[in-house]
Every structure is written in C-alpha cells, then in structure tokens.
Amino acid sequence: MARIAGVDLPREKRVEVGLTYIFGIGRQTSNKILAATGINVDTRIKDLTEEEVNELRKLIDADYQVEGDLRREVSLNIKRLKEIRCYRGIRHTKGLPVRGQKTKTNARTRKGPKRTVGRKKKK
C-alpha cells in the first residue's frame, strides 16, 4: 500500500480515484496532480514505482493543504465564526443549516432526529 499524507491508499484502485481518499483532494485536484507529475490516470496504485510515489508525496506536501492541517483550519474557521457571534456562527452553535436552507420542514440531517413535544389530553 502506498502511504501519502498519512493515508494508506487502496492498492487495487486507479491512481486518480485512490488520491481522493486523502482529505482535501477530490477528482479534479487528483487529475491536476497527475498531470503535473506526468503519471497516467489509468495506472493502478500497486503498479506505481517508488519514484512516482515519492514524486506524488513531494508535490502534495509542497502545494496542497490536506488531512490534519486542512481539518484544523476548517475547525478554526468555524470556531472563529462562533466567537464573533455572526449569523453563520450562531447557526453552527445551534446545529442548524448554515447556508440559508429552510428549516420549517426537512433539515433533519443538521437538526437530528425528530423530538415530539408532548401535550396534555383534554378531559
């Protein structure tokens, strides 16, 4: 298994797809990296030479913010929004959708499972 940026890449996958297992690298970024290094998109990870793996590793470490650093930056950005008490920060704090979606119905992913409020029966 090739290990890049602290992530074990699956051996049987194509390099294009395998790189997307690294947090912060999607298909488009993966294709840019492969174009820059000159590695064929259809190559399987198990078929990469040690030189090619090192080249990928160097390029990703130098030019891209991935894994722990990126996660830390995102969490610090959210923390800053919460501290300055802006609208987006308040939505994060309350666990509601941040980007303007309606919440009268739906929004269950952010709000969690439905909690029914009990009421007294009439006599």
Curated annotation (Swiss-Prot):
Signal peptide: none annotated. Residues 101-123 have a biased composition (Basic residues). GO terms for molecular function: rRNA binding; structural constituent of ribosome; tRNA binding. Residues 95-123 are annotated as: Disordered. It comes from the Bacteria. GO terms for cellular component: cytosol; small ribosomal subunit. Keywords: Ribonucleoprotein, Ribosomal protein, RNA-binding, rRNA-binding, tRNA-binding. GO terms for biological process: translation. Part of the 30S ribosomal subunit. Forms a loose heterodimer with protein S19. Forms two bridges to the 50S subunit in the 70S ribosome. Belongs to the universal ribosomal protein uS13 family. Located at the top of the head of the 30S subunit, it contacts several helices of the 16S rRNA. In the 70S ribosome it contacts the 23S rRNA (bridge B1a) and protein L5 of the 50S subunit (bridge B1b), connecting the 2 subunits; these bridges are implicated in subunit movement. Contacts the tRNAs in the A and P-sites. This is Small ribosomal subunit protein uS13. It comes from Alkaliphilus metalliredigens (strain QYMF). The gene is rpsM.
